[in-house]
Amino acid sequence: MSIFTPEVNIMIKEARTEDAAKLIEYTKIVGAQTDNLSFGKEGAGDTHEVEEFIKKISSDPNSVMYFAWKNDDIVGCANISGMKRRMSHRANFAISVAKSEWGSGIGSALLEKCISFAKDNGIEIINLDTRSDNIRAISLYKKFGFIKIGQMPAFSKINGEYIDADLMYLDLREKSNNRRKIEAYERLEAIRRENKKEIDFNKEREEAMNKKHKIQP
């Protein structure tokens, strides 16, 4: 999969163990750019740890990791981590994008790839957590249908400050999709009704004003 415009040429590929060094380099960059991740400028681990992590994901039929490549550098990363046994219908999701590429569509492309993988592999529920003040990420998740189901107080601690996290999920079951369509339609109808009320109110007010002006001497 690729994102190509006159300004952007991005390739999205599945992770390989030989990409470990590039991934470490990437995590050090993004870890220094934002406090929205579980790691800082130290990155996600050493070469052995990262290679083992990629191997573990690659060997699990319900897990996947994608990298967004710009030339020879990773500028985005997302993964689906499947669960086992009675929770095998669920998976956890995580994503990060280099700050230089925010707003380029990479986040949407990575999330779309992961959702497609989940559907193809029988995953019904995708869970994620994100800082409660990470408005950009929350907006992205909502765009794809994720719903907030709770909040975890003191989810992380950075420089002595406790950070809360929103817990969100995406239900991929067909029944749920139909329910979401109905809810979206009902919200739209509610907005239309409110707009009609406002139009009717303004019309009545205008008529009253006109009537008032007519009876004045």
Question: Could you describe each region identified by the protein language model?
Answer:
Residues 95-100, 104, 132-133:
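Active-site acidic-Proline motif in GNAT/NAT acetyltransferases
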